[in-house]
UniProtKB/Swiss-Prot annotation:
Homodimer. It catalyses: aldehydo-D-ribose 5-phosphate = D-ribulose 5-phosphate. The keyword Isomerase applies. Pathway: Carbohydrate degradation; pentose phosphate pathway; D-ribose 5-phosphate from D-ribulose 5-phosphate (non-oxidative stage): step 1/1. Substrate binds at T28, G29, S30, T31, D84, G85, A86, D87, K97, G98, G99, G100, K124. This is Ribose-5-phosphate isomerase A. Belongs to the ribose 5-phosphate isomerase family.
């Protein structure tokens, strides 16, 4: 199976965990798109009744186009389960997210969810975080000074730009700075450091967050229990 087939596989597996009446956090990214399609099929074919809370405008639009009811996070009092993707997951089930420039909303939804599930193809499972650039969402005001501070700290930062040379904008109209670190040996320490930098709204380290990981492998989906 190619990578897209593996993504479709885990998307279909993940929606088996969605129960009637759930308030579901809906993530963002290429793998989640397959999950939303599979969820739409259950809504259509089984009459599944759920409320979705999306982590990006594009996920909300896709879900609504398939008949899934979407509400804002502030309109619900809890989330039963959030299903999202990840860019890297290490041996301790710590993750990097934000390749789709949605990690701020993703993290807000995740921390308000009773359970979190990540769905990935096998290429996302790594021994150490850091080969994938670590995204930071930063406010535009003073962002060049934030970039310079990060550079002086040795984090090898760069603004994420579009093909036309414009800043990539998040749904909150902020910029993305990617840190090209190579390897992250102490993710909790790094998270604390980044949390202390004025102008950084949120980083893409998702630590001690996920409960279940579904990995798309050539011989089928593998379900991993990360934490209770």
């Amino acid at each position: 199976m190619d990578q897209n087939a593996l993504k479709a596989l885990v998307g279909q597996e993940a929606v088996k965990y969605v129960e009637d009446g759930m308030i579901l956090g809906i993530g963002t990214g290429s793998t989640v798109r397959y999950m939303i399609d599979a969820l739409g099929e259950r809504v259509k074919n089984e009459g599944l009744h759920i409320i979705g809370v999306a982590t990006s405008d594009r996920s909300a639009k896709q879900a609504e186009s398939l008949g899934i009811t979407i509400k804002e996070l502030d309109e619900v009092d809890h989330l039963d389960l959030t299903i999202d993707g990840a860019d890297e997951i290490d041996d301790n089930f710590q993750g990097i997210k934000g390749g789709g420039a949605a990690h701020l909303w993703e993290k807000i939804v995740a921390i308000n969810s009773t359970k979190n599930m990540w769905i990935v193809d096998e290429s996302k499972m790594v021994h150490h975080l850091g080969a994938f650039p670590l995204p930071l969402e930063v406010i535009p005001f003073g962002s060049s000074h934030v970039l310079e501070k990060l550079n002086k700290m040795g984090f090898n930062p760069s603004f994420r730009m579009t093909d036309t040379g414009e800043h990539v904008l998040t749904d909150s109209k902020n910029y993305i700075i990617d840190l090209h670190l190579g390897r992250i040996d102490h993710p909790h320490d790094l998270a604390n450091t980044l949390n202390g930098i004025v102008g950084v709204v949120e980083h893409g380290l998702f630590l001690d967050t996920v409960n279940t990981v579904i990995v798309g492998r050539q011989d089928g989906p593998e379900v991993l229990n990360a934490r209770d």
